[in-house]
């Protein structure tokens, strides 16, 4: 059973598998090699991927995207508060966690970002299963290198809800470097800078690749909230202001108009990567007003200038952390759809003194490609192409505990190799202190109040002694997924306590995950029932039209009375179909059976009357158990 690699993106996701010595990027049921990270809820069904994105203008409030911008964050996070202004769906505060509120089958439902992401993961898993012809359990899932502990944990939870055994969470730029290193058969030792600008996140990683098989991450930097969508927002605001000037109306209050404008703005942005001007034509955009406009590449670059320039800061930081000079970088590899923007390439190239950028890997697929390689390695694939590959990654943020005065005392420095283990000895702050509170933080600031708290626990049973006497060993153990385990042990008594940082404020409990997993199975069953219903309806329709057409074109092989009774019966059935669009599968099947019982004798008679030895038309499923496909595709 092969293991797969999934690039779970903000706007698009991609899945690959390593087999027969090479990686296959797998196309979905629409033939697309990337799938929109969209989930939509309607009165009758749940849609995921292309089908969800295609109906978004008709159903903006119940079409959910950008779950990756919500995952592992608190509701009051300033980035989320900023995003809420742009999202057509409703985000609510559930005990400090953001939840997405939608209307599904006529009822209000709330989903956590993990559940929405799990639905996208399920879609990617099913895409792989359809291609491989077998069930898939194991996967490597990628996250931005700059994701913190709670965002990584939440992504792992999303995998669990999707019924996936997550072999490892790996960093996107590291996965892209794997793809680059193995695809290019690199010789010698090369310093490679991966510049990964996607739909919602931005990462820079510097790796040393030795002989194309040892991949050592030297440093990583980035912004988990910068990407193509931020450029779209700037364009949308620009056009909305223009509309307001022209028509004295603000379309931003209307989710449908805003969505149509966003789709057109995104298309214009893509056009501007290859042309110097893009035009927008949207009929009846808002209150009957057509909106026709143009935007030049120069104008777009001015609108997003500060965001584009911001991408260079993490590049400088990564170089500094890796203790490297610009001239020491051999290859600059571009990953993520937003690196197609000419201005982004131009700024980066100028930063490196005109050095040619490497555009040789597919920016949309490189991350899934690398994840598929890592999945094969972790599942024990011994193929010659990957048997020597060794990947050494790093921690994106420093980890430490709070000591007297609210000071952040670091145990693991950022860019330390992972997995890693570090210990330090601490003591009590007051005489006869019976317990110590260990507060764990991540971040780079000197005071803990400016960093992100990961968890807290108490070590009790410290024997009474003057301050400074008891010795408490604190050990940080950071695993290969970048997830932290903390142990505190009192030397005198051997008393110990440990926690895996599960960021309880933002994390799902095991019970939550189990509940969501069973709900996910229930939704999958409902989806299957819905598919069967549509199939039964199509079967009935196909039979209806077929019989009606055969009767009408039967000529003298069918009597006028038989013909009119068939046409009448078919018209009745069509009316029934139109007024029973939400009938159950069994009702459609019963109706088909009824119709067959009535029409089959006449059809047989007509066929015999024809006497030309032709085969009777086989509609739907007539007696004799018709084996061919009886279902047509429905959009």
UniProtKB/Swiss-Prot annotation:
Q: PTM Phosphothreonine: at which residues?
A: 127
Q: What is the lineage of its organism?
A: Eukaryota, Metazoa, Ecdysozoa, Arthropoda, Hexapoda
Q: Which GO terms describe its cellular component?
A: cytoplasm; cytosol; nucleus; plasma membrane
GO BP annotation list: chaperone cofactor-dependent protein refolding; determination of adult lifespan; protein refolding; response to starvation
Ranges for region Disordered = 606-635
Q: Which InterPro entries match?
A: ATPase_NBD (IPR043129), Heat_shock_70_CS (IPR018181), HSP70_C_sf (IPR029048), HSP70_peptide-bd_sf (IPR029047), Hsp_70_fam (IPR013126)
Q: Which family does the UniProt entry place this protein in?
A: Belongs to the heat shock protein 70 family.
Q: Which GO terms describe its molecular function?
A: ATP binding; ATP hydrolysis activity; ATP-dependent protein folding chaperone; heat shock protein binding; protein folding chaperone
User: Which organism is this protein's natural source?
Assistant: Drosophila melanogaster
On whether Secreted is a keyword of this UniProt record, the answer is no
Q: A Pfam family name for this chain?
A: HSP70
Write down what this protein is called: Heat shock protein 68
């Amino acid at each position: 059973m092969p293991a797969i690699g999934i690039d779970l993106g903000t706007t698009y996701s991609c899945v690959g598998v390593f087999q027969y010595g090479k990686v296959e990027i797998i196309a979905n049921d629409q033939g697309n090699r990337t799938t929109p990270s969209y989930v939509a809820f309607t009165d009758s069904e749940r849609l995921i991927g292309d089908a969800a994105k295609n109906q978004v203008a008709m159903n903006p409030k119940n079409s959910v995207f950008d779950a990756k911008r919500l995952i592992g964050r608190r509701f009051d996070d300033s980035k989320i508060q900023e995003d809420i202004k742009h999202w057509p769906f409703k985000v609510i505060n559930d005990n400090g966690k953001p939840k997405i509120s939608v209307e599904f089958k006529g009822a209000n439902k709330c989903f956590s970002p993990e559940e929405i992401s799990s639905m996208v993961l399920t879609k990617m898993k099913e895409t792989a299963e359809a291609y491989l012809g077998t069930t898939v359990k194991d996967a490597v899932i990628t996250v931005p290198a700059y994701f913190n502990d709670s965002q990584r944990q939440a992504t792992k939870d999303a995998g669990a809800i999707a019924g996936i055994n997550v072999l490892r969470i790996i960093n996107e730029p590291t996965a892209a470097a794997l793809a680059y290193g193995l695809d290019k058969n690199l010789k010698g030792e090369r310093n490679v800078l991966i510049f990964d600008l996607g739909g919602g996140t931005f990462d820079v990683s510097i790796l040393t690749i030795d002989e194309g098989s040892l991949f050592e991450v030297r440093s990583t930097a980035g912004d988990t909230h910068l990407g193509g969508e931020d450029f779209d927002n700037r364009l949308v605001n620009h056009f909305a202001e223009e509309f307001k000037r022209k028509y004295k109306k603000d379309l931003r209050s209307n989710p449908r108009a805003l969505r149509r404008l966003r789709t057109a703005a995104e298309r214009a942005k893509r056009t501007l990567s290859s042309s110097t001007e893009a035009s927008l034509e949207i009929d009846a955009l808002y209150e009957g007003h057509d909106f026709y406009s143009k935007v030049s590449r120069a104008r777009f670059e001015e609108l997003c200038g500060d965001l584009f320039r911001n991408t260079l800061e993490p590049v400088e930081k990564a170089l500094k952390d890796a203790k490297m000079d610009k001239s020491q970088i051999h290859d600059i590899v571009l990953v993520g759809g937003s690196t197609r923007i000419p201005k982004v390439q131009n700024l980066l190239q100028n930063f490196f003194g005109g050095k040619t950028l490497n555009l040789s890997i597919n920016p949309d697929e490189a991350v899934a490609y690398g994840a598929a390689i890592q999945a094969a390695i972790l599942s024990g694939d011994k193929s010659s192409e990957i048997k020597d590959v060794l990947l050494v990654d790093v921690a994106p943020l420093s980890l430490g505990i709070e000591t007297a005065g609210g000071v952040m005392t670091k145990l693991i420095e950022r860019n330390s190799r992972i997995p890693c283990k570090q210990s330090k000895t601490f003591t009590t702050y007051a005489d006869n202190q019976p317990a110590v509170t260990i507060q764990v933080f991540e971040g780079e600031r000197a005071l803990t109040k400016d960093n992100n708290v990961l968890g807290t626990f108490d070590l009790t049973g410290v024997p009474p002694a003057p301050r400074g006497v008891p010795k408490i060993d604190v050990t940080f153990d950071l695993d290969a997924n970048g997830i932290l385990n903390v142990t505190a042990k009192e030397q005198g008594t051997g008393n110990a306590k440990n926690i895996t940082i599960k960021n309880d404020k933002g994390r799902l409990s095991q019970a939550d995950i189990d509940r969501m997993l069973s709900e996910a199975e229930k939704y999958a069953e409902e989806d299957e029932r819905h598919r069967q219903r549509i199939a039964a309806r199509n079967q009935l329709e196909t039979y209806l039209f077929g019989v009606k057409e055969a009767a009408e074109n039967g000529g003298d092989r069918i009597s006028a009375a038989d013909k009119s009774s068939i046409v009448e019966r078919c018209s009745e059935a069509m009316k029934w179909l139109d007024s029973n669009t939400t009938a159950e599968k069994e009702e459609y099947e019963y109706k088909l059976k009824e119709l067959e019982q009535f029409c089959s004798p006449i059809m047989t008679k007509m066929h015999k009357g024809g006497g030309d030895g032709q085969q009777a038309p086989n509609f739907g499923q007539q007696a004799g158990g018709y084996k061919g496909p009886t279902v047509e595709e429905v959009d």
